[in-house]
Amino acid sequence: MRLDRLTNKFQLALADAQSLALGHDNQFIEPLHLMSALLNQEGGSIRPLLTSAGINAGQLRTAIDQALSRLPQVEGTGGDVQPSSELVRVLNLCDKLAQKRGDNFISSELFVLAALESRGTLTDLLKSAGATTANITQAIEQMRGGESVNDQGAEDQRQALKKYTVDLTERAEQGKLDPVIGRDEEIRRTIQVLQRRTKNNPVLIGEPGVGKTAIVEGLAQRIINGEVPEGLKGRRVLALDMGALVAGAKYRGEFEERLKGVLNDLAKQEGNVILFIDELHTMVGAGKADGAMDAGNMLKPALARGELHCVGATTLDEYRQYIEKDAALERRFQKVFVAEPSVEDTIAILRGLKERYELHHHVQITDPAIVAAATLSHRYIADRQLPDKAIDLIDEAASSIRMQIDSKPEELDRLDRRIIQLKLEQQALMKESDEASKKRLDMLNEELDDKERQYSELEEEWKAEKASLSGTQTIKAELEQAKIAIEQARRVGDLARMSELQYGKIPELEKQLEAATQSEGKTMRLLRNKVTDAEIAEVLARWTGIPVSRMLEGEREKLLRMEQELHSRVIGQNEAVEAVSNAIRRSRAGLSDPNRPIGSFLFLGPTGVGKTELCKALANFMFDSDDAMVRIDMSEFMEKHSVSRLVGAPPGYVGYEEGGYLTEAVRRRPYSVILLDEVEKAHPDVFNILLQVLDDGRLTDGQGRTVDFRNTVVIMTSNLGSDLIQERFGELDYGRMKEMVLGVVSQNFRPEFINRIDEVVVFHPLGEQHIASIAQIQLQRLYKRLEERGYEIHISDEALKLLSANGYDPVYGARPLKRAIQQQIENPLAQQILSGELVPGKVIRLEANDDRIVAVQ
């Protein structure tokens, strides 16, 4: 008999049998070796065949292993093994059986039949396991489905549905799928398309995270519960596992062979199976090589004839990119659009999923947490869809609470560290013999005993709280199982079991759960097991950097004293500081318009009066860092073509993938201060882009993504009208001067731009009285730098007056002051430090000497 007439699986099993004989030091390859190899073969036909015939494959394997251990062993054969006469006889019988059946190749299941018709140890073992020629023949017919073996890979294609699909209806029966709430319209539309005679293939299209896969799971659950039309009752929903289908397909045509096997198996089911292909676009081009047919083209004939009931799911972009290009494939599918659910629908979905997440995380999820997750995620996470982003918030908040339950409470941890510290000190003091050390040791022992007592009490309490939590968890798990059992009993019509569960077990468990929850609520001191809206806000703040959590007392006071904080850096300019402070307070109190930026301001005034400094102070106040603002120098955007740098290059241009300078910065930090410095120097087209930002708090970048500016403070600075401010300052009141400056501004900016700004703030020129305060602030920075090098410095009032007089220029504001400090203080100090006149550790005094400032120690 030619070995190349065996199927691939049979050839592999024969090679494994040879290895087995070598390993056992047997001289001959017996039918037992081959049967053992076939039973252990991954993805082979023998185990499913025996199971189908009602034979316990595990027991048979044990019996064969025992028989193998009794075979005679020969040493010193030098690895020479050959088939025994018995094996040759059985293989010849296989050949004969294959010819009778009209097979071109000999498949491995015929070996079991041939072994039964032969005689020997294997025959006896098979018969004692319950195998007969009749039941094995019947199982073979069932497995083959009336087909003959015409190619070597025939066995690989068998049970393709089992290998390459996941049965969603089976998972729904076992209660492993999450409940699907709402989405009735989409599920009804899907069923409607599936009921058609031809082209009965719906494709679910929607943004990522809106619940396309959940709709198919909902369909599977409805089929199980019998809540579908007659035409769909008893159908199975199988999800195609593309990963398994492609994995390991090494040779050309192997992928197509597997897919063909799946399609053949589906054809045999005669419409009793609905195939679900998640990420449908992956089928287009899958397995495509030079001249080969891709998966999409292989599906077309079956889809068009209505033989294959297929439900696809893909996103809008990928549908357009892959499926719309192939018009022949597109027309075979019927589109079902899945829109993002509203906040109200999302709350209903979350309430339905609540129990599953409570069971998984062993925590309690409150209703305010669910409402907060839906509303906050809708408002603050712009680039993702509901319900996915809301579910993620709940999941992560529950996970963080669970982590706190599992880890040691902070109070215990602090005590533990203190005990370790005291023990180390105790060890050190025990080595000392002086009186002071002994006295300290006695005190330390007392403290140590006290801390250890506290620790053990707290630990007991912690363990008790953990135990009570796990108690409620066990009851919840039992209740969940009882609910699944009642559903299964309802499907099969077991009324006795249903009544036992409904009126006996479930009410009893609910009573136990209520009692356990009440006792739990009384005792909790160290552990929190509830997810509230505060935890949701905390997680959201961690994701986006937007402070949406409830304000602590300290933060409220800080916001009420905001003007004082800003005035510590920005001298004068009361109107500007007040306008900015009010905008931030409105935002944190939740009163600002949710569809516009927190605040948008145009700062006008002469150079050096604190316009940019106020932005830095604001960023520092909000984020504790001057760098936490997006600063864009508008003088860089003077040409028309440079506008695209803000939002990103359009498609087809170099740099398209990189995104825009402004949009990318805000996408990364949605909560920030945006400073557009020297705004009048920018090209007029830049203002057209800013119109959407100021009005709707949004901007579309070069790649079509919408960037959310609703949590930003937009500040623009300009020098327009500064000559008027300089000339008329002191002559006119603030209101009159502001009107005049706005007249100049309206000549440079369009009315629709000025109209969208919350407030135009005119900065005053600085007076001599302001310069002294600014000098103090500037000097503080110098003191800090010197302090790091070990120098302490003080300035006399006369020296400060002299410095202010030298640094004051009504035209240039406070900037000349910086130069004055540099020339009159920093330069002489640097020389004196380098020459060694000034030494670290001693106080340096800055005194006025005529029109100079001198440093003395």
Curated annotation (Swiss-Prot):
Description of how activity is regulated: UMPylation of the chaperone by YdiU negatively regulates its activity, facilitating Salmonella survival under ATP-limited conditions.
Organism for this UniProt entry: Salmonella typhimurium (strain LT2 / SGSC1412 / ATCC 700720)
Positions with a binding annotation for ATP 2: G605, P606, T607, G608, V609, G610, K611, T612
Residue numbers spanned by region Repeat 2: 83-146
Taxonomic lineage of the native organism: Bacteria, Pseudomonadati, Pseudomonadota, Gammaproteobacteria, Enterobacterales
Any Pfam family hit: AAA_lid_9
Protein modification: UMPylated on a tyrosine residue by YdiU under ATP-limited conditions.
Alphabetical keyword list: ATP-binding, Chaperone, Coiled coil, Cytoplasm, Nucleotide-binding, Repeat, Stress response
Main subcellular location of this protein, as a coarse class: cytoplasm
Family under the similarity heading: Belongs to the ClpA/ClpB family.
Region (Linker), start-end ranges: 341-545
Keyword Cell membrane: no
Ranges of residues in domain Clp R: 3-146
GO terms under biological process: cellular response to heat; protein refolding
Disulfide bonds: none
Region C-terminal, annotated ranges: 766-857
Region (NBD1): 159-340
Free-text note regarding domains: The Clp repeat (R) domain probably functions as a substrate-discriminating domain, recruiting aggregated proteins to the ClpB hexamer and/or stabilizing bound proteins. The NBD2 domain is responsible for oligomerization, whereas the NBD1 domain stabilizes the hexamer probably in an ATP-dependent manner. The movement of the coiled-coil domain is essential for ClpB ability to rescue proteins from an aggregated state, probably by pulling apart large aggregated proteins, which are bound between the coiled-coils motifs of adjacent ClpB subunits in the functional hexamer.
Region (Repeat 1): 6-71
Full protein name: Chaperone protein ClpB
Subunit architecture: Homohexamer. The oligomerization is ATP-dependent.
